[in-house]
Amino acid sequence: MNPEHSPLGKATVYAAQYDASLLFPIPRAGAREQLGITSALPFFGTDIWNAYELSWLNTRGKPQVAIATFYVPAESPNIVESKSFKLYLGSFAQSKFDSVDAVRDVLKRDVSAACGASVSVQLVSAHDFAKLEMDELDGLSLDRLDLDTDVYEPDPSLLSAADGENEAPVEETLVSDLLRSNCPVTGQPDWGSVQIHYVGPQIDHAGLLRYIISFRNHTGFHEQCVERIFLDIMHACKPVKLAVYARYTRRGGLDINPFRTNYNQPMPDNARTARQ
């Protein structure tokens, strides 16, 4: 299914009852082919979706609320278009379920089917909301740099690294809050923070920040932008290890946080940032 045929940017009709058919899958293959990925993936990872507007009725008709987190594997053939996800979650509002576990099971079944892979689902009920953390991405801020730039479309030529043959490899974690891209269907801006951890030749910090800023007028889904960042850094800077993690601000009660890496490591922290 193409994004142009999704509910995004169209008049909305809100379902009165639970409806799994509202989920609109979008194949990853098209965007990945544009990045030159036609066979085995050069990374693995997860897309972490947090849903803050989930509610349903218990068997006695009393509303229940929860925050849901979905872990979608990067190797899944599809992503779910975000507005369709919002409408799907909204369809739970007037439907009765026996328990929180029953809701979780339905969410896992439906979203896994739409994505074409097993999706993990966690629900946090209202009585546990106080346990949820807020934190900023760890790392050295690139935004501290005072620089000029005038490139606002992705330009990998801005990236460079030290000569790997003559310089010792370094290990760094770098962060920026200046990531912005735009929805390819509606043109609405998507605001994000990005964390880049690598081992390899020293990456030029000013060039990396200019590169991140260069996404400012780019149109692409969150997942596609992170994969492009990963591939451009791999090609231009040739790190031995690389992990890219972005946390985008929420829209329609959902935030999307893609993570891509080429080495084994724990799942990144899902603590929301202040802007989320």
Curated annotation (Swiss-Prot):
Listed under catalytic activity are: 7-aminomethyl-7-carbaguanine + 2 NADP(+) = 7-cyano-7-deazaguanine + 2 NADPH + 3 H(+)
Top-rank taxon of the source lineage equals Bacteria
Tell me the lineage of the source organism.
Answer: Bacteria, Pseudomonadati, Pseudomonadota, Betaproteobacteria, Burkholderiales
- Tell me, what's a Pfam family for it? QueF
Q: How does it assemble?
A: Homodimer.
Q: Name one GO cellular component term.
A: cytoplasm
Protein's cellular compartments: Cytoplasm
Top enzyme category: oxidoreductase
Q: Which residues form the active site?
A: 183, 190
Would you tell me the protein name for this molecule?
Answer: NADPH-dependent 7-cyano-7-deazaguanine reductase
The species this protein belongs to is Burkholderia orbicola (strain MC0-3)
Recorded family membership: Belongs to the GTP cyclohydrolase I family. QueF type 2 subfamily.
